[in-house]
Amino acid sequence: MMLRMRRLVIATTNPGKVIEIRSALGEMAGWSLEALPPDTRSIEETGSTFLENAMLKAEHYSQLAGSLTLADDSGLWVRALGGRPGVHSSRYAENPGARIQRVLGEMKSVPDGRRDAVFYCALAVAKRGKIIWTVQRDVVGVIAHAPSGSEGFGYDPVFLLPDLNRTMADLNTDDKNRLSARGKALAELRKFLLSD
């Protein structure tokens, strides 16, 4: 008997995010994971929370793809910056390097003990424009004084896990999938998809 593959579209054109999602979900019998075409136009993220933005994207792209669609919205919340960059994390500067430099510049005079930060991840799954599942996870850390590590993407090089004294970008893929907000959220998604 031939197993019918179910399709899950990953609603992003960010190659780093696609790699991370595929890695965290691993092989799932009966599922085919597909990314959006690179020329897909992004929609305006008008939500005031990560979950609202994930839901907006999941609803929109599930209608375009005609398939079950996963959307993610995630970002960095820094107490000393009044919660910035927050839902504007991916738009805080023109490119990932500039975003990191902006955060480090704004944190330059902030002493240890006041550099706490939270990385949030919200996932939403939609089918034919309707949300059918959501999850939110976070991880607590601090902003490092300088970038470290070459793994990951985004703010990973400056998001330090104090218990390990390593940034997210210092971690190997397995550790990052286990400890990161996105990794924790994707573990929940995997359970959801395989239980259906």
What are the roles of these predicted feature ranges?
Residues L3-V9, P15-D196:
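Anionic-ligand binding patches
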